[in-house]
Amino acid sequence: MKTQRTRSQERILNVLKSLNRSISAQDLYIELRSREMSMGLATVYRALEALKLDGMVQVRTLANGESLY
């Protein structure tokens, strides 16, 4: 069964597709704000986690513990 994506998840997916590069959740938050699609940082993290669990995004964890999506 396909899960329904939230508006926040859709916005994040669109930004990730347009960037064509890996980005941290913090940088994604800043990018969303610059595109006037502001949402809370906690919302960004929750949406990324849900997208990861659905297999829509891949995560890579760097040696310093930072995750890139």
Say what each PLM segment does:
Residues 45-49:
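Short, hydrophobic-biased segments on the C-terminal half of alpha helices
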Residues 18-27:
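Short capping segments at the starts of secondary-structure elements
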Residues 55:
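Glycine-centered, phosphate/nucleic-acid-interacting loop/turn motifs that mediate DNA/RNA or nucleotide
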Residues 61-67:
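Short, Lys/Arg-rich nucleic-acid/phosphate-binding segment
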Residues 27-33:
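A short acidic, leucine-rich amphipathic alpha-helix
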Residues 1-14:
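Short alpha-helical segments that sit at the start of domains
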